[in-house]
Curated annotation (Swiss-Prot):
GO terms for molecular function: inorganic diphosphate phosphatase activity. This is Inorganic pyrophosphatase. Signal peptide: none annotated. Monomer. It catalyses: diphosphate + H2O = 2 phosphate + H(+). The lineage of its organism: Eukaryota, Sar, Stramenopiles, Ochrophyta, Chrysophyceae. Keywords: Hydrolase. It is an enzyme of class 3 (hydrolase). It comes from Ochromonas danica (Golden alga). Belongs to the PPase family. Its EC number is 3.6.1.1.
Length: 12
């Protein structure tokens, strides 16, 4: 999945 943080970075 993927999650968007406050900075808008996606983490797999």
């Amino acid at each position: 999945x993927y999650a968007f943080g406050i900075n808008g970075t996606x983490r797999i």
